[in-house]
Amino acid sequence: MEETANDGSHSEELFSHFESRSEKEGLPQDASESHLSCLKQDIQNEKTELEALFKEAELATCSAELLLPLFKDTIEEISFENRGESLSNLLEKLTDNERENINLKNKVLEKETYIQELSSLFQNEKANALKASRFSQSVKVVHERLQSQIHKKEAENEKLKEHIKSLETQISEWNLQLKKNKYEAVAMKESSRQKTIALKKASKIYKQRIEHFTGDMENLTSQIREQEAKLSETVSASNAWKSHYEKIVIEKTELEVQIETMKKQIINLLEDLKKMEEHGKISCEEILRKLHSIEYENETLNLENTKLKTTLATLKDEIASVENELLELQEVEKQQKTLIEVYKTQIQKVQEAAEMVKSRCKNLLQENSLITKNKNKKLKKVDENHSLLTKLSLEEENYLIQLKCENLKQKLEQMDAENKELEKKLANQEECLKHSNLKFKEKSAEYTALARQLEAALEEGRQKVSEEIEKMSSRERALQVKIVDLENELRKKNEEQNQLVCKMNSKAQHQEVCLKEIQHSLEKSENQNESIKNYLQFLKTSYVTMFG
C-alpha cells in the first residue's frame, strides 16, 4: 500500500511537471541553444524516472498475483470455526486489493497515455529544436553579416574620428593663432595707451611750459616797463636838475669854484650814464639771448611734433597690418564654413548608407524584429549623437571664432577712434604752437622795438650832454670875465651851494639805490632764466626717457 501511494505521488509530481513544461512551451520560441540542451537533459531524466516507475509497478502486480493463491490456500486451511469472522475480513481485504489493482491498472494506463503524450511532445520538441537550430544558423549568418557591417561602420567611424582629430588639431592651431593675435592686439593697445599717455603728459608739460614762458614774458615786460618808468623818472630828474643847473649857472656865472664843482658833478653824471648804458646793453643782450633760447625751444618742439607724426604713421601701418590679419581670419572662417558643409554632406551620405543598411536588415530580420529594432535604435542613437556632437562642436567653434572676430573688429574700431582723437589733439597742439610762435614773434618784435627806442633815447641823451658841454664851455669863457665881480657874492652863495651839494648827494644816493634795485631785478631775471633752462633740460631728459 505504501509503495502504491508513493507511486501515485510521484506520478502526480511528474504530471504537474509536465503541465509546467507544457505551459512553458506556450512561451515565445526565442530561447537559445543552451535552453534546448537543458530541455533535452530534463526529458531524458524524466524518461529514466518513468522507466523505473514502470518496473516498480510490474513488480507490484506480479507480487499481488502471487499472493492471491496463497490467500486462497490460507482461507481453506483456516478452521471452520473462525471461518465466519475471518471470511469477512479476508473478503474486505480482497476487495481492497482488487480495488488497488484496478487503481494501479488505471494509473498504469494513465502513465502509458502520459508516456505517449511525452513521446509526442518529445518529438515535437525535437522538431522545434531542429527549427530552432536552423533559425539559430540563419541568425548566426545574419549576425555575422551585421558584425561585418558593424566592423565596416567602425572602420568608417575610426576614419571619421581621425579626420575629426586632424580637424581638432587644425582648430587648436587656429585657436593658438587667435590667441597670438589677441596678445599682439593687447600689446598694441598697451603700446598705444602708453603712447597716448606720453602724448598727454608731453602736451601737459608743453602747456605748462607755455604758461611758464608767458608768465616769464609778462614778468620781463613788467620789468622793462618798470625800467622805462625809472628811466623816465631819471630823465625827468635830470631835466629838473638841468633846469635848476641853468638857473644856478645864470646866477653864478662869475663863480669858478661853482663851475669846477658843477664840472665834477657833470663828470659823475656822465659816468652814471655810461653805467646805465652798459646795464641797458647787458639787459638787451640778455633779452636777445632769451629770445634765441625760446626760438631754439620752438625748433625742438617742432622736431618733437615731427617725431609724433612719424609715430602716428607707424601706428597707422600697424592698424593696416591688423586689418590684413582680420581679412586673413575671415578667409579662414570661410574655409572652415566650407569644411563644415563638406562634413555635413559626408554625414548625410553616411546617414543615407546607414538607412539603406537598416532597410536591408529589416527585410532580412522580419522574424527577429525585436533584436533588430533594439540594435537599429542603438545604432540610430549612436549616429545621431555622433553627428549632433560633431555639428555642435563645429557650430560652437564657429560661433566662438565669430565672437572673437567681432571682438577684434570692435577693438580695431576703438583703436581707430583713439587714433582719430590723437590726431585731433595733435592738430589742436599744432594750432596752439602756431599761435604761441606768432605771439613769440610779436613779443620779440616788441622787444626789438623797445631796444631800438632805448638806443635812440641814449643817443638823444648823449647829444644833449654834448650840447650842454659846448654851452658850458662857452659860458665858462663868459664866466672868467665875470669872476672878479662875483667874488663878493661867493661868500653869500657858499651856504646855498652847500645846501645844493647836500641835495645832489641825496639824489646821487637815490640813483645808486635805484641802480641796485635794477641790478637785483636783473639778477632775479637771470635766476629765473637759469631755472627755466634747468626745467627745460629736465623736460628733455624726461621726454628722452619716456620715448627713447
Curated annotation (Swiss-Prot):
GO biological-process terms attached to the record: cell projection organization; negative regulation of cilium assembly
Keywords: Cell projection, Cilium biogenesis/degradation, Coiled coil, Cytoplasm, Cytoskeleton
Coiled-coil ranges per UniProt: 98-177, 206-282, 394-506
InterPro entries, A to Z: Odf2-rel (IPR026099)
Subcellular location: Cytoplasm, Cytoskeleton, Microtubule organizing center, Centrosome; Cytoplasm, Cytoskeleton, Microtubule organizing center, Centrosome, Centriole; Cytoplasm, Cytoskeleton, Microtubule organizing center, Centrosome, Centriolar satellite; Cytoplasm, Cytoskeleton, Cilium basal body
Bias-annotated ranges (Basic and acidic residues): 9-27
Keyword Cytoplasm: yes
Gene Ontology CC terms, in alphabetical order: centriolar satellite; centriole; centrosome; ciliary basal body; cytoplasm
Principal location class: cytoplasm
Region (Disordered): 1-35
The protein's role, per its UniProt record: Acts as a suppressor of ciliogenesis, specifically, the initiation of ciliogenesis.
Family to which the UniProt record says this protein belongs: Belongs to the ODF2 family.
The protein's name in its UniProt record: Protein BCAP
